[in-house]
Amino acid sequence: MKKSLITLALITITGTAIADSNSGHKEMGHNAMGHSTEMTMDHSNGMAMEGMTDVGMPAAGAKPTKVVHVLLSDDMKIRFKKEVQIETNDVVQFVIMNTGKIDHEFSIGSASEQIEHREMMKAMGNHAHDSGNAVTVKPGKAKQLLWHFHGEKNVELACNIPGHAESGMIKKMAL
């Protein structure tokens, strides 16, 4: 009984002390807390997630409304096995097959985002990577990408491995 009373008293005292020490914190500005007002945090991209683009975002875990089979080939073409009309708000499961003998990338974005990604790939050398809006597919292999289309209506699919898009490995779509 005595231990219970001591424990209860300690919890009460500790809780009160913590509450008192935090009570004025909300009212204090950055200056009052000794923080510089010259530096501010940029929260403009606070909601951005990996792979989010001007034309949509990854849709991991979502149920696709359409399935599109994509063929990447060494003749530097991106083809749909069967043509399909993709619309705004569609969730598309892309099944991407590399039918060639060299690596290819499948990237989703706006034309300006693809140019930016292409420049990054050139600067990095032939660095294969997967991200929310792009996958690199080895020869004879397949990968999947689940994508929710929204935003800009002009979409560009591209292989941004150096030299590939420049050789025509781009597919343009209008939603």
In which residue ranges do the predicted regions lie?
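Cleaved targeting-peptide boundary
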Residues: 19-29
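A eukaryote-biased signal for short, well-structured alpha-helical docking elements
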Residues: 42-65
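Short aromatic-acidic-glycine turn motif
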Residues: 112-123
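Short beta-strand and strand-turn-strand segments in soluble, beta-rich domains
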Residues: 121-131
